[in-house]
C-alpha cells in the first residue's frame, strides 16, 4: 500500500479542497494510506523529527510545507516531494504553485468592468502568492489607467489593525479592494465595520479561495475568486503515483489557475450604476 505523508493543516478551505482532489485520485487508483503531521509537530520536534518519522513510517511521498533549506528531503529519503509555495518557489522539489499574477489580473478586470477608477490591494509581504497577486493586479490597473494603492505587511492582524484602519479611511472612495485571500478580506470587512466604512458603497471587496465559511461570516458576505484546487490535488496524486512507479522522473510544477468569481448571494461587490 502506498503511504503518503501530509505536512498540511486542515484549517483552510484551500487545504481541504486540495486533499479532496488527492483523496479522489487515491480512491480511483489506491488504496493509499495517508498520515498527517500538523504544523505544531514541526514546532515541537523540528524538521529532523519529521525526517525521522518519514523514515520510520517508510513514507512513499511527502506533500506539504517545508521551510528548511538545510535538509534535502529527496536526498535523505529518495522519495517524491511536492511543496506548497509560501515564501518562494522551490528549485529543489516539485511545486504546488499557482497563476498568482493571472489571479490578480482577473480581479482588476472584474472591478474595471464595474467602472472603478480607484484600486487597492491588501496582502502579506514577502510571500510569493501574495506578492505575485499584487503584481498582477497592479500591472492590470496600470494598463487600464486606474489609480493604485496597496498595504502589505508581514505582521499579525492585531499589530496592524490601527494602521490598516487609517489606510482604509484615507483611501479615495469608491475604491475596489482586492485581498490576497479570504482570511485577509474578512479582516478588512471587520475593520471597515469597526470604522463605519460601508461595503460595498465605499469599498468593494474581493478575496481569493472561495472559502464559504470565511466569506459568509462577513456582513455583507465576501465575493471571492474560485481556484481549481481540487483538480490540482488530483494532479498531484497522478504525478507522484507516476514517480513512485518510476514512470516519471525529475520535478514538476502543478499550477492552480483561477476559474471564476463567486458572487451568488454575496454583496461585497455589487454592480455600480
Explain the meaning of each model-derived region.
Residues 1-61, 70-272:
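Bacterial carbohydrate/catabolite-sensing allosteric modules
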Amino acid at each position: 500500500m502506498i503511504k503518503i505523508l501530509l505536512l498540511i493543516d486542515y484549517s483552510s478551505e484551500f487545504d481541504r479542497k486540495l486533499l479532496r482532489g488527492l483523496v479522489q485520485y487515491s480512491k480511483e487508483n489506491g488504496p493509499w494510506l495517508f498520515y498527517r503531521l500538523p504544523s505544531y509537530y514541526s514546532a515541537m520536534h523540528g524538521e529532523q523529527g519529521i525526517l525521522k518519522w518519514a523514515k520510520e513510517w517508510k513514507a512513499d511521498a511527502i506533500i506539504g510545507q517545508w521551510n528548511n533549506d538545510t535538509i534535502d528531503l529527496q536526498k535523505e529519503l529518495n522519495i517524491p516531494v511536492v511543496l506548497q509555495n509560501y515564501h518562494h518557489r522551490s528549485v529543489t522539489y516539485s511545486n504546488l504553485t499557482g497563476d498568482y499574477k493571472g489571479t490578480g489580473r482577473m480581479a482588476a478586470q472584474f472591478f474595471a468592468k464595474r467602472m472603478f477608477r480607484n484600486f487597492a490591494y491588501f496582502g502579506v509581504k514577502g510571500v510569493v502568492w501574495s506578492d505575485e497577486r499584487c503584481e498582477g493586479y497592479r500591472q492590470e490597473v496600470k494598463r487600464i489607467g486606474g489609480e493604485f494603492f496597496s498595504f502589505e505587511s508581514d505582521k499579525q492582524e492585531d499589530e496592524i489593525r490601527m494602521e490598516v484602519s487609517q489606510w482604509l479611511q484615507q483611501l479615495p472612495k469608491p475604491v475596489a479592494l482586492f485581498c490576497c485571500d479570504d482570511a485577509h478580506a474578512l479582516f478588512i470587512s471587520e475593520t471597515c465595520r469597526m470604522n463605519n466604512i460601508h461595503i460595498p458603497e465605499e469599498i468593494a471587496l474581493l478575496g481569493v479561495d472561495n472559502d464559504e465559511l470565511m466569506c459568509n461570516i462577513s456582513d455583507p458576505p465576501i465575493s471571492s475568486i474560485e481556484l481549481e484546487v481540487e483538480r490540482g490535488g488530483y494532479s498531484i496524486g497522478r504525478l507522484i503515483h507516476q514517480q513512485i512507479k518510476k514512470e516519471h522522473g525529475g520535478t514538476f510544477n502543478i499550477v492552480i489557475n483561477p476559474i471564476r468569481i463567486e458572487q451568488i448571494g454575496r454583496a461585497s461587490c455589487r454592480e455600480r450604476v
